[in-house]
C-alpha cells in the first residue's frame, strides 16, 4: 500500500550529543539519551529524529506495512505515520517536508516501492503523492539537480529570523538567508557538527504551500 508520510528522521554525525544539543537549542526539542551513545529529539509526544554516530547525513524513515531498506539513504519502518499530509499539522521543531535531490531521477522506483503517484510541480521539480486515505496529497518532492544528492529535510519554525539568529548564536551557519520559494518562506542552515537542513516558517500543513495548492 502507499506510504503516506514519515515515521521519523535519523541524523548521523561525528558528535551526536553536541549535534542534538544544537538542534534542541534552535528548535526546542526535548532530548532523551538512548543506548549506545545515541539521542532522540521530540516535540511533545512525537518523535522527530534520532541522532547517532556515523557518516554524516540524514536518513528518512517512511511509514509502511513492510519494514525494508530503500535506496538513497531511506527505509520503510512499520508503524503509525507521525509526520505527513494526514498526520496532525507540523508544530515548530517537527519535520514538515522532505525532498529528494538527485541528478538522475528514478520516479518509477519510488512509485513501485511506496505506491506513490507522480504529479507535476515546477521546472525540474515533481511531487510524489499518496492516495492511501482518499484524494491524492503530496508526501515528498523530487528535484533534479547536480548541486546536491540525498534527502533534504525541512523542519518547521514559528519565526524564521529568530531561528536563524539562534543558529548563529550556537555557532551554526546560515547557508541560505531567509527567502521565499514555492514551498514557502525558508532558510537553509547547518549545525557546527553537521546536519544541514531547511527551516520552513509557519507551514500551513505538510509540504507548506504544496499542502494547500
Language-model regions, residue ranges each:
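Vicinal oxygen chelate
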Residues: 5-15, 38-47, 52-103, 119-135, 141-144, 170-213, ...
Amino acid at each position: 500500500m502507499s506510504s503516506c508520510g514519515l515515521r521519523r528522521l535519523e541524523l548521523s554525525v561525528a558528535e551526536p550529543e553536541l549535534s542534538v544539543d544544537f538542534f534542541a537549542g534552535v528548535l526546542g526539542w526535548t532530548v532523551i539519551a538512548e543506548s549506545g551513545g545515541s539521542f532522540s529529539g521530540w516535540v511533545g509526544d512525537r518523535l522527530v529524529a534520532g541522532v547517532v554516530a556515523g557518516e554524516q547525513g540524514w536518513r528518512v524513515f517512511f511509514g509502511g506495512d513492510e519494514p525494508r531498506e530503500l535506496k538513497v539513504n531511506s527505509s520503510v519502518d512499520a508503524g503509525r505515520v507521525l509526520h505527513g499530509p494526514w498526520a496532525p499539522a507540523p508544530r515548530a521543531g517537527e519535520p514538515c517536508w522532505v525532498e529528494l535531490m538527485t541528478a538522475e531521477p528514478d520516479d518509477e522506483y519510488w512509485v513501485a516501492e511506496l505506491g506513490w503517484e507522480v504529479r507535476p510541480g515546477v521546472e525540474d521539480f515533481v511531487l510524489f503523492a499518496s492516495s492511501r486515505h482518499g484524494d491524492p496529497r503530496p508526501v515528498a518532492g523530487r528535484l533534479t539537480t547536480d548541486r546536491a544528492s540525498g534527502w533534504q529535510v525541512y523542519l518547521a519554525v514559528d519565526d524564521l529570523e529568530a531561528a536563524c539568529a539562534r543558529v548563529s548564536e550556537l555557532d551554526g551557519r546560515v547557508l541560505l538567508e531567509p527567502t521565499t520559494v514555492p514551498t514557502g518562506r525558508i532558510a537553509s542552515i547547518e549545525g557546527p557538527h553537521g546536519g544541514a537542513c531547511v527551516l520552513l516558517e509557519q507551514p500551513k500543513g505538510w509540504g507548506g504551500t504544496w499542502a494547500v495548492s
